[in-house]
Amino acid sequence: TKKVFQSGFVWRVVRQKWPDFEEVFFGFDIDKILLMPDEMLEQKASNPAIIRNFNKVKTIRENALMIDDVRRQHGSFATFVASWPKDDVVGLWEFLKKNGARLGGNTGPYALRMLGIDTFLLSRDVEAYFVEHGLITGSVRSKRSLKTIQDTFLTWQQESGLSFQELSQIVSFSCGDNYVGMAN
């Protein structure tokens, strides 16, 4: 939920209001959230203590439902995510996008990082790297491009022993606005 609200908002504001979010939404207890009727959700969405974006507030219950469905099928959401094949991180992104609410783009990967799952991010600089080096053509988010990007990160990880997060940061700093050059 935090990453859903941070998407498109000033992250500092979300962080400042986060304790109020936790209080308003029962500490994000899935079972309690699932019991909330529509009227209660609407009431909570108008609470000035939180960010009053009803469309994003609705995702709290929608994503709680997704988590509940997964835990019913797999024992727990954490087990499901942790057991996802490490060489198919893009598949996990797709699962979150398809089954969750507002978890597409980089929101899903950011949420996974927050859960301790190693993933790369498709920042503008990472995307630019893959395009500038001719590794992908066309849409960066196409299945073909995502497979190429994932396979490249897997190769780099096997060669370097670094995490996807570390590799993602290195790529980001190697081109675009964040380029960090070497002094002569």
Give the location of each predicted region.
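Short, aromatic/basic-rich helix-turn unit that serves as a nucleic-acid recognition element
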Residues: T1-V13
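Short, solvent-exposed positions on alpha-helices
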Residues: R12-V13, K58, Q165
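Alpha-helical ds-nucleic-acid-binding substructure associated with the helix-hairpin-helix region
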Residues: F26-R102
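C-terminal accessory module of base-excision DNA glycosylases/AP lyases that mediates lesion recognition
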Residues: A82-N184
